[in-house]
């Protein structure tokens, strides 16, 4: 038996130890918690969690400086680089910008007679990252000529001779005006990785007024990414900033949600800490993709729906609808959440039915769950219209703008229906619920036997204990008609069940929205232990501490911290399909 399997068995035994104390509950009604007001203890606990998490999230997020000036080649345009004399190159790196194409590379000793040295393909996976220019490694030359095939942006070119960067002259000065940005090697802190090649690029295109490349998701998520770029430039820190910020902002929403549900500061603090330091939450909010914003809006729409069904105030129902609209304009997975909200709303009205009030509420919902979201969704395509030369409010009433929106919906549906390409880290829904197949986002081996890597998967403490607690909630629902458990289960299944029937290629990060409800299920069991077990602190605080300890243990595999490769494998490969 490998040492890593020992950790797996030990953790499962500890989870069982902490949860075995769960008593059989009395029926719990929604809104029955008494002490739901936010107090100074809550402010202190939440403040500490947010501060510690923010430090962890923003540390090593990405470089705050990178090449900002680009030479914008036209197809067929050349740039000649003069090294001053014939030199033997150790190698070269280039930082690619927007658009795809290629560079034909030639070398010359006299600037008149040229020989081919190879080419470099600036394809979509090479954008906004440092790429080794292998064609120039070991070449002896004075002049280098790059000829673009396609309209491509090139940010910086670093040429190394005799072990150091060598200053050169060129008729494309933008290629050598930020030499201090040239790194020793490509790394996730100085380059894009995984789907950042789509979303960060599209965010910049929205800023630049260029029709976006990535149109397989609605626009709002990329517009939020663009806000970070506008603040901090087109740098790794800039395009990841918004996601990390929203990861922090999720925490007060989760804290308030748990406090409203269960009325205990201790439960809210423990649940929020477990959510904050969940692996998926940490990794996914530090990458410039759109899943973070979907989960943020899902949290808010369910929180305000809960406030509505327990308080009956229409403003809460309206806010739930607004956040549903913002979520749907970020990613279609929020539409699944909308189905869950509809079920919760319908159950509420079946229990409080009065025809006149019901019809009025239906009309209200048509406004805030159909009309308002449709307006938000439609308006989010503004950058698409602007890139086609439209401007002002009038574009929204243009048939051309409407065609852009409609055509994109058709494309998205066709695209997502047809994503069946095999991927080494793809996984199915049944693998997500047991954490069986994480998706590896980044892996780099170094000559000294260390490596840097990270991927998306749940903290095994949350994943396994949360699944057990979800099953416990289902038992409570059947035996006691427990309303709190029903609310949690509806939210969980709304996010998970659609993936059971979807045949496209899927990944572990699609389980991110469901993790919100795993936390709530865990807190439901915590609350029962808190109310009925004399030594509840051992169980509740013990499982919370175990979750935080797992985060510390796995931190290198979540942050990209360089560690010894063999040591990481021995300690972190808890299941056969974990890529560590």
Positions of the model-derived regions?
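Transmembrane helical bundles and short interhelical boundary loops of multi-pass, membrane-embedded
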Residues: 1-45, 49-81, 164, 177, ...
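Hydrophobic, aromatic-rich transmembrane alpha-helices
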Residues: 20-25, 445-449, 453-481
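Aromatic, loop-rich ligand-recognition surfaces of beta-strand-rich domains
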Residues: 27-31, 56-118, 124-193
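Short acidic/glycine- and proline-prone juxtamembrane loop motifs at membrane-interface regions
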Residues: 239, 243, 280-294, 333
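Transmembrane-helix motifs of polytopic, lipid-linked glycan transferases
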Residues: 241-262, 300-304, 472
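Transmembrane-helix signature of polytopic, membrane-embedded enzymes
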Residues: 254-277, 310-319
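Membrane-interface alpha helices of multi-pass inner-membrane proteins
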Residues: 272, 316-332, 495-496
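Membrane-interface transmembrane helices that cradle and orient dolichyl/undecaprenyl
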Residues: 301-317, 327, 346-353
């Amino acid at each position: 038996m490998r040492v890593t399997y020992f950790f797996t068995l030990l953790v499962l035994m500890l989870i069982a130890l902490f949860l075995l104390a769960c008593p059989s509950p009395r029926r719990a009604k929604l809104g029955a918690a008494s002490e739901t007001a936010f107090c100074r203890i809550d402010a202190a606990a939440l403040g500490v969690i947010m501060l510690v998490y923010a430090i962890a999230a923003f540390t090593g997020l990405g470089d705050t400086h990178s090449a900002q000036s680009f030479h914008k080649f036209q197809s067929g345009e050349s740039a000649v680089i003069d090294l001053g004399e014939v030199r033997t190159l150790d190698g070269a790196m280039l930082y690619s910008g927007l658009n795809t194409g290629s560079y034909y590379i030639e070398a010359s000793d006299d600037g008149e007679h040229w020989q081919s040295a190879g080419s470099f393909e600036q394809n979509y996976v090479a954008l906004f990252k440092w790429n080794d220019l292998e064609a120039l490694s070991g070449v002896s030359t004075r002049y280098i000529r790059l000829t673009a095939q396609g309209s491509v942006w090139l940010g910086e070119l670093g040429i190394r001779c005799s072990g150091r960067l060598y200053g050169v002259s060129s008729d494309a000065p933008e290629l050598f005006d930020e030499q201090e940005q040239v790194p020793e090697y490509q790394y996730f802190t100085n380059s894009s990785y995984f789907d950042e090649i789509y979303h960060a690029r599209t965010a910049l295109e929205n800023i630049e007024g260029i029709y976006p490349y990535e149109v397989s998701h609605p626009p709002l998520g990329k517009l939020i990414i663009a806000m970070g770029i506008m603040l901090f430039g087109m740098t790794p820190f800039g395009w990841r900033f918004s996601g990390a910020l929203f990861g922090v902002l999720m925490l007060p929403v989760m804290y308030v949600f748990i406090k409203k549900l269960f009325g205990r500061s201790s439960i809210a603090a423990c649940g929020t800490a477990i959510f904050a330091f969940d692996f998926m939450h940490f990794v996914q909010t530090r990458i410039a993709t759109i899943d973070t914003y979907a989960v943020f809006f899902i949290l808010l729409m369910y929180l305000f729906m809960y406030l509505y069904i327990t308080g009956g105030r229409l403003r809460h129902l309206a806010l739930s609808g607004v956040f549903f609209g913002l979520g749907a304009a970020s990613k279609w997975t929020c539409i699944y959440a909308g189905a869950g909200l509809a079920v919760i709303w319908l159950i509420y009205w079946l229990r409080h039915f009065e025809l006149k009030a019901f019809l009025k509420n239906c009309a209200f919902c048509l406004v805030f769950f159909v009309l308002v979201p449709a307006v938000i969704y439609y308006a989010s395509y503004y950058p698409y219209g602007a890139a086609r030369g439209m401007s002002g409010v009038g574009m929204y009433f243009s048939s051309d703008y409407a065609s852009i929106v409609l055509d994109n919906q058709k494309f998205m549906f066709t695209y997502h229906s047809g994503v069946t390409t095999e991927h080494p880290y793809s996984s199915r829904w049944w693998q997500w619920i047991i954490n069986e197949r994480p998706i590896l986002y980044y892996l780099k081996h170094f000559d000294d036997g260390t490596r840097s890597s990270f991927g998306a998967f749940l903290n095994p403490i949350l994943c396994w204990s949360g699944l057990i607690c979800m099953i416990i909630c289902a038992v409570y629902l059947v035996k006691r008609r427990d309303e709190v458990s029903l609310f949690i289960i509806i939210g969980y299944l709304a996010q998970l069940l659609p993936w059971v029937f979807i045949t496209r290629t899927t990944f572990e990060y699609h389980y991110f929205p469901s993790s919100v409800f795993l936390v709530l299920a865990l807190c439901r069991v915590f609350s029962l232990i808190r109310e009925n077990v004399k030594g509840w602190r051992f169980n509740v605080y013990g499982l919370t501490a175990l979750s935080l300890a797992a985060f510390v243990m796995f931190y290198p595999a979540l942050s990209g911290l360089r560690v010894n490769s063999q040591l990481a494998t021995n300690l972190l490969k808890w299941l056969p399909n974990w890529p560590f």
